[in-house]
């Protein structure tokens, strides 16, 4: 970031200036396809970007699945993402042509990709190893939330919910209750949190700065959460494992091909709406 003459994204975030327009300005300044420089890599950045509009493609409202494929902000967001393709402004790492559709950790580590979309586990599994190998300073690896939509009333981010399910017919109900309770106690115990923080620093090379930022981003009060149910309407038309399915094509299609969102929507909307109607009918 510093070598490219760019502002620190985290500092922009803290000042309330980390927005789509700021991000796009940075993207165009950094990207240089002729010299292998790109702004973004990762498996599904388009999904997280859509959630910054505050509206998911498919929401759950009053117990029913609701489509928002015609939402103007979603269309605006995906049109922005369309510009990343190599048929447009060439802002994303061309993993489809350069790396067999796989994101490149090495290109990021070599400073050729500015942002890499992934979870915090990627630091422990991959980035810290580059840090050790290359003897980087602590501030060589950082992260930032997805930018806020310009003019948004709140700062929205994609969120998900992890659940511990009780299987029908389970025999050890008391054990299930004890597991739930122990998780609840552990999550609210400051001594356990402190011990976990020290373990993260000692075993996984986290710094206090990164852990502080991670705590900020994980705090439910920091952002307004957006839950997208688009991948829960059937493996045949909605799964991240196959980008050619109808639901994934709505977001990944424009990002990876440069074709318009409206063209993908026209192709798949009827099929998706029919599935939502089918699922909603089962709970009437």
Give the role of each language-model region.
Residues 1-13:
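Aromatic-glycine-rich donor-binding/catalytic loop that engages nucleotide-sugar donors
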Residues 2, 16-67:
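Extracytoplasmic/periplasmic solute-binding protein
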Residues 12-15, 57-76, 133, 149-155:
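Short, solvent-exposed loop/beta-turn-alpha elements that line the ligand-binding surface or hinge
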Residues 22-30, 101-116:
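Short helices/loops that flank or line small-molecule/ion binding pockets
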Residues 24-29, 62-99:
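Glycine-centered hinge/linker elements that transmit conformational signals in sensory
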Residues 44-45, 118-127:
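Beta->alpha turn/N-cap motifs
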Residues 131-202:
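Extracytoplasmic/periplasmic substrate-recognition and gating elements
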Residues 168-177, 185-284:
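Conserved C-terminal helix/tail region of periplasmic/extracytoplasmic solute-binding proteins
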